[in-house]
Swiss-Prot record:
It is an enzyme of class 1 (oxidoreductase). The lineage of its organism: Eukaryota, Metazoa, Chordata, Craniata, Vertebrata. Belongs to the shaker potassium channel beta subunit family. Pfam families: Aldo_ket_red. The N-terminal domain of the beta subunit mediates closure of delayed rectifier potassium channels by physically obstructing the pore. Regulatory subunit of the voltage-gated potassium (Kv) channels composed of pore-forming and potassium-conducting alpha subunits and of regulatory beta subunits. The beta-1/KCNAB1 cytoplasmic subunit mediates closure of delayed rectifier potassium channels by physically obstructing the pore via its N-terminal domain and increases the speed of channel closure for other family members. Promotes the inactivation of KCNA1, KCNA2, KCNA4, KCNA5 and KCNA6 alpha subunit-containing channels. The gene is KCNAB1. Homotetramer. Interaction with tetrameric potassium channel alpha subunits gives rise to a heterooctamer. The active site is at Y124 (proton donor/acceptor). This is Voltage-gated potassium channel subunit beta-1. It is found in: Cytoplasm; Membrane; Cell membrane. It comes from Gallus gallus (Chicken).
C-alpha cells in the first residue's frame, strides 16, 4: 500500500505544472466543465499510477504469499474471499480419532503456519467436531476477521425435519451449528449433498436468507453435479438471489475427472471455484498401505470396512504399484510422497484450497510442507506423473483439438 501511494504521489508531482497551465486556460470556463475535467484528470492519474505499479512490482491478484510463513492465498472461486491454499478439515479426526488436546495442537500449528481456513460439518461426530472447533477458537482468542470458518448442512438429526436442504433445516441447522461453534456467523455454509426432495428455488432462497441475516457470508455446494450447480446458479440469477461460490469435491491422484474437467468450465462460466478434500485418498497415498492394512490404521476400523476392501482390491493393488513408481520423483524433488501428492493438487490453478486431514502434529507438519514443493511442480514433472498414473481426463475441447 505504501508503494502504491508513493507511485501515485510521484505522478501527481510530475503533473503539477500541467495542471496549473490547464487551470489558467480554463479560468473563465463554467464550474461544471472544470469539475468534469478535474475528475477526468484524477481518474487518468490513478489509472496511470496503477498501470506503472502493477508490472513493476509483479502484483498477482489471484495468488499472494505470506512472507513469514510462506503460505499462499487464493480467491475462493471468483468471490473476493481470500483463503489459504491449504486448509484444515475436521472429518473423522475432531471428536473421534483424536483427543481435544491433539485437536488444539493441530489448529495451533495450522494457524501459525498461515492457514486461515478451518472446515467442519454438522454431521461430523454428531456435532461434536463443531463443539471442539468452537471451544478451541474461543480459547485461542484469534481475531475472527482473520479466520475463514466453513460448515456443511444436510445430516442434522434423526427426525425427518432435521435433515436435507429444506428452508426449515437450512435455517435451523445453521443456527444450531453457530451455537455449537460459539460464533455469530460462518464464512461459508455448504449444502453437503444435493436434495432431490427440495425444490432448487427453495434451497437458493434459504441460502440467500441466511446470508442476508448475517449468519453466513457465502454459500457453496458439496458433492453436487455440474448440472445441479448450474441449476442453482440459474435460479439465483432468475430471481435475483445469491448463487454458490464454491464446490467441495474429492480430488487426488486417483480421482480427477470432476475437478479437472467439469469444475473448470463452471469456474469460467459462472465463477464457481473448487475447495478439494482427501488429497491423500483417505490415507491410501500416505504409503502406509503398501504392505497390507496395519491394525492401527483407519482402514482397520469396523466402520471403514469399505476402505479396507478398496485397498485390498485389484484396483487398490494397482494403485499401490503406481505409488511405488512415483516415489523416485518425490525423492528427486526432496520431498515425501504425501507432500508430492498435496503439491500435485495445489498445482491446479482451479483449486482454491486443499483441505488436509491429520491425526497427529507430525503428519500435519509434513503435509504443510507441500507449499515448498509447489514451485518444483514443473510441466515436465506433472507430465511424468501423468505418464505413471495413466488416468488424465480429457474434456470435449481436448478431443476436438
Amino acid at each position: 500500500m505504501q508503494v502504491s501511494i508513493a507511485c501515485t504521489e510521484h505522478n501527481l508531482k510530475s503533473r503539477n505544472g500541467e495542471e496549473r497551465l490547464i487551470s489558467k486556460q480554463n479560468a473563465a470556463a463554467p464550474n461544471v466543465v472544470n469539475a468534469a475535467r478535474a475528475k477526468f484528470r484524477t481518474v487518468a492519474i490513478i489509472a496511470r499510477s496503477l498501470g506503472t505499479f502493477t508490472p513493476q512490482h509483479h502484483i498477482s491478484l489471484k495468488e499472494s504469499t505470506a512472507k513469514q510463513t510462506g503460505m499462499k492465498y487464493r480467491n475462493l472461486g471468483k468471490s473476493g474471499l481470500r483463503v489459504s491454499c491449504l486448509g484444515l478439515g475436521t472429518w473423522v479426526t475432531f471428536g473421534g480419532q483424536i483427543s481435544d488436546e491433539v485437536a488444539e495442537q493441530l489448529m495451533t500449528i495450522a494457524y501459525e503456519s498461515g492457514v486461515n481456513l478451518f472446515d467442519t460439518a454438522e454431521v461430523y461426530a454428531a456435532g461434536k467436531a463443531e463443539v471442539i472447533l468452537g471451544n478451541i477458537l474461543k480459547k485461542k482468542g484469534w481475531r475472527r476477521s482473520s479466520l475463514v470458518i466453513t460448515t456443511k448442512l444436510y445430516w442434522g438429526g434423526k427426525a425427518e425435519t432435521e435433515r436435507g436442504l429444506s428452508r426449515k433445516h437450512i435455517i435451523e441447522g445453521l443456527r444450531a451449528s453457530l451455537q455449537r461453534l460459539q460464533l455469530e456467523y460462518v464464512d461459508v455454509v455448504f449444502a453437503n449433498r444435493p436434495d432431490n426432495n427440495t425444490p432448487m428455488e427453495e434451497i437458493v432462497r434459504a441460502m440467500t436468507h441466511v446470508i442476508n441475516q448475517g449468519m453466513a457470508m457465502y454459500w457453496g455446494t458439496s458433492r453436487w453435479s455440474a448440472m445441479e450447480i448450474m441449476e442453482a446458479y440459474s435460479v439465483a440469477r432468475q430471481f435475483n438471489l445469491i448463487p454458490p461460490v464454491c464446490e467441495q469435491a474429492e480430488y487426488h491422484l486417483f480421482q480427477r475427472e470432476k475437478v479437472e474437467v467439469q469444475l473448470p468450465e463452471l469456474y469460467h462460466k459462472i465463477g464457481v471455484g473448487a475447495m478439494t478434500w482427501s488429497p491423500l485418498a483417505c490415507g491410501i497415498i500416505s504409503g502406509k498401505y503398501g504392505n497390507g492394512v496395519p491394525e492401527s490404521s483407519r482402514a482397520a476400523l469396523k466402520c471403514y470396512q469399505w476402505l479396507k476392501e478398496k485397498i485390498i482390491s485389484e484396483e487398490g493393488r494397482k494403485q499401490q504399484t503406481k505409488l511405488k513408481d512415483l516415489s523416485p520423483i518425490a525423492e528427486r524433488l526432496g520431498c515425501t510422497l504425501p507432500q508430492l501428492a498435496v503439491a500435485w493438487c495445489l498445482r491446479n490453478e482451479g483449486v482454491s484450497s486443499v483441505l488436509l486431514g491429520s491425526s497427529n502434529p507430525e503428519q500435519l507438519i509434513e503435509n504443510l510442507g507441500a507449499i515448498q514443493v509447489l514451485p518444483k511442480m514443473t510441466s515436465h514433472i506433472v507430465n511424468e506423473i501423468d505418464n505413471i498414473l495413466g488416468n488424465k481426463p480429457y474434456s470435449k475441447k481436448d478431443y476436438r483439438s
